[in-house]
């Protein structure tokens, strides 16, 4: 389906910065962001799980972005690779309309995703 919302669409793993003694990313994910109709977005899993890869299925809920007071800054709810929710002290930013940064400061981890071009 076509959308005029520049945030909606597919986002693919770009890179990460993390301390593996605090956290290990569960894969090189492809995600879909879909508007929730209230200024936020549902984050849906598409592909790329490495941890418990057989249990992750396309379109499963991977997280949510909730709007904050700053433009392009969101509070983040995340479902980790083992299906555990992470909801405190985490946030997300979208820069240049093309880079989604998920920040987990207490886990010394940042994951970045790039917006995939829309195919017509």
Language-model segments: residues:
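Central antiparallel beta-sheet cores of small beta-barrel/beta-sandwich binding domains
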Residues: 5-91, 103-105, 114-116
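Intrinsically disordered/low-complexity terminal segments and short unstructured peptides
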Residues: 100, 108-109
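Short, low-complexity, Pro/Ser/Thr/Gly-rich segments in the mature regions of secreted, periplasmic
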Residues: 110-120
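Residue-level recognition of beta-strand termini and adjacent short loop/turns
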Residues: 94-98
């Amino acid at each position: 389906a076509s959308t005029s919302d520049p945030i909606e669409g597919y986002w693919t793993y770009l890179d990460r910065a993390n301390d593996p003694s605090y956290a290990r990313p569960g894969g090189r994910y492809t995600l879909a962001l879909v508007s929730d109709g209230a200024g936020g977005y549902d984050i849906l899993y598409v592909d790329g799980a490495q941890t418990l890869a057989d249990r992750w299925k396309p379109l499963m809920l991977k997280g949510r972005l909730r709007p904050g007071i700053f433009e392009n800054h969101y509070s983040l709810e995340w479902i980790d690779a083992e299906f555990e929710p992470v909801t405190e002290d985490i946030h997300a930013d979208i820069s240049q309309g093309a880079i989604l940064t998920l920040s987990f400061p207490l886990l010394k981890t940042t994951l970045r995703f790039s917006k995939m071009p829309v195919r017509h």
